[in-house]
Amino acid sequence: MEQRSPRLRWLVVWVVAVVWMGAVLARLSYLQLFCYSEYFAKAQHQQQRVFEISPMRGVIYDRKGRELAISIPMDSVFADPVDVKDPEMVARLLSRALNLPAEELETKIREASKPVRLAKKLSPETVERIDDMNLKGVFFEKENRRVYPQHELLAHVLGWVDVDEKGMGGIEHELDKWIRGRPGRVMVMADGKRRFYDRREAAADPGAGVVLTIDETIQYIAEKELALTMQQSHAHTGTVVIQDPSNGALLAVATAPAFDPNDYGKYSDDDRMDRAVTAAYEPGSTFKIITMAGALEDGVTNPDELVDCQEGSILVAGRLIHDHKPFGILSVRDVLAQSSDVGTIKIALKLGAPRFYDTMRDFGIGQLTGVELPGENRGLLRPLENWTPSSIGSLAIGQEVSVTPVQIISAISAIANGGTLYPPRIVQEIRGGTPIALPPRGEPKQATDSKTAATLREMMESVVLEGTGKKAKLNGYTAAGKSGTAQKIDPNTGRYSPNQYFASFAGIAPVNEPAVTILVVFDSPVGQHFGGDTGGPVFERIAEQVLAYLDVAHDVPTQPNTQTTKNNPGQPNPNNARAAAETANTENEARFQAAVAQKNPDAQSSAPTVAFGEEDAVTVPDMSGQTVRGVIEGVVIDQAKAAVASASLTESDASFAALLC
C-alpha cells in the first residue's frame, strides 16, 4: 500500500489537472463560440468613443435662388463620465453658463456610460464662457441649427424642424428624406488608461437643396396685403394663393395668422396649419364659375340667353332658396356678374345632375391635387348616388361641397389658360450631387374646351366691370374674377350661421393673356363680409404690384394720378417694383451675411425682403428680424415714412444675432 500511494497521488493530480484544463478549454470554447460578440462589443466600448455628426440640411431656395431656409453649424457641449472626476462640481459650474439645474446636469453625467450631450447648439458667448472654465472631460462638437432668415415669410409652406433636425411641417417634412442628408461618425480610440491615441471620421453627407416655384418678392406682397386686411377686418384666418396659370406653378402661398418657424413652439397647431392645402371650406359663389363652365360647354345656355330670376327665390325639391337681392330678367352674363343664386340654379337644372357632377370632377373637385405639401385635404364632393333631390340647387351655388384654396385656384387657372387643369406644384427642382428625380406628379388634363374658357373669361370680366367685383378693377390691366360669400356651418346647430361667412375673390389678370391667377379667402371677417368688398380690394392691390414686378405690359390705358390706388389711398403704385426688388436682393444679401458672420464666420446666407415705399418708387429696407405685421404697421400704411428705405440695420442685425443665441 505504501508503494502504491505516490502513484495514486500522481494519478489524482493528473486527473484533476486534466479536468481543470478541460474546464478551462470548455469555458474558452464557450466564450469564443457563444459570447464573442458580447465581449467584443464590451472591449470596443472601453476602447472607442463614437459620436454622430449631424448632417447639414439642404438649403431651401425660392425660384430665383434666394435662400429661405439654411443651416448654421453651432457648438453643443458634451461630458465624458470617465474623465469627469467631480460631477457635482462640474454640474454646478456648467449650470450657471447653461442656465440649467445643476441637479439635472449631475444626474446626466453620473448615469452616463459614454459621453453625453448636456446642451445643444449654444451661442458663441456661452461656448466661450464654458471654454474658459477649462473643465476636464467637457468638450464641444459641432451640430447644425436650422434658421429661417425671413422669419414669418412663407412659414406655413417651409414648415419647421424639431430639436433633432427632423422636418415637422411643410416642405421640411414632405421632402425630409432628400433635405436631411446622412449623418457622419467620429470614432476616437483610447488605451487601457483612457488616453486617446487615434481619431477616425466618416464625414456626413449634406442634404439636397430644394428650389421652390415660390417667388420671394411675390410672397412678400401677398403676405403684406393679407396681413393688412386681416388687421382691418378682424377675420379669424386668411389665405392668398397666386399661381402661374400656364403651368400650375405656385408663386405665393400666404396664410394668416402667421408664425415664426425659428420659434415654432410658441404657436398653436392652428397657427401652424397651412390652410391653403389642409383647410376645406364651402366656396359659395366662386363655385358658380364651374356651374357655368358645364352649361356653356354642353350648349344648354349662352351668355346672352335671358333667365327669369323670379324676384329672388326658387323652390328646389321642396327647399326654398333666396337670392341675396331680388332680380327679375337677367342675361346669363349678368347672372354671373350680379351673382344671382336663382339664375345659377336654373342653369344647373338645365344642365342636369349627372353632367354637372362630371364637370365638377373634370375641374378636380373632391380629388387630391398632389401638391408637394403634407396633409392635403381632398375636400368633399359626394358621389352622385348620394345626392338628395335638392343637392343640385345647393351645389350650383357652392354649398354641399367643400374645397381647398389650392383646388379652387387650379380650377380658375384652367379657365385662364384655355381649359387645361394643371396639377399645382410648389417644388421646381431638387439639387444634389447627382441628379434627383422629383416626386411623381399628376398629368395635366382637359377640364373644359378653349372656347368655353374664353367665354367664361369674358363673362368674369363683366363681374369686375359691372358686377359684384367692381372693387377688384385694376389700373392699367384688364381683370376677370368672381366673388364669393358663403355662410359657415354653425358647429353647435349644424345649420348655416346667420352672421359667419367665408368671403373670397378669385381673379385672373390680364384677361386675354393671363399672367397670374389670384385667390383671396377670409374666414369670418367683421363688418363687410361680402367677397367683393373684402377680397376684391386685396386682389386689386396684389395684382397691380405683382404684374408690375413681372413686367407685364399694360393692356388698357392707365388712369391719371397713379401714385395711389382707389381702394387703399396709403398704398403706393409699384411701377418700378422689379428693379427695386433686384437691387434689394443684392444689398440685403451682403447685410444678412455680415450679420451671420458676426456670430458664426462659417455660416453665410442671404435674406432679401421687399417692402413698398412711397408714390411711384419702390423702397427696399432690410426687414430680416421683423414680422410681417410689424412691417405693415411701421412701413406700408403710412406713405410719409419713405425714409424707411435708408433705415439703420442695427435693429435687424440685432434681431438675427439674438436668433442665433
Language model region names:
Residues M1-Y264, A280, G352-G366, G375, ...:
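Periplasmic/cell-envelope proteins involved in peptidoglycan metabolism and beta-lactam response
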Residues P124, K224, I289-M292, P354, ...:
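Residue-level marker for well-ordered alpha-helical positions
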Residues T217-I221, A447, K451, T455, ...:
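A generic alpha-helix signature
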Residues I221, I290-G294, D334, S410, ...:
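Residues within well-formed alpha-helices
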Residues G476, R541-C661:
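Ligand-recognition elements built from short beta-strands and adjacent flexible loops
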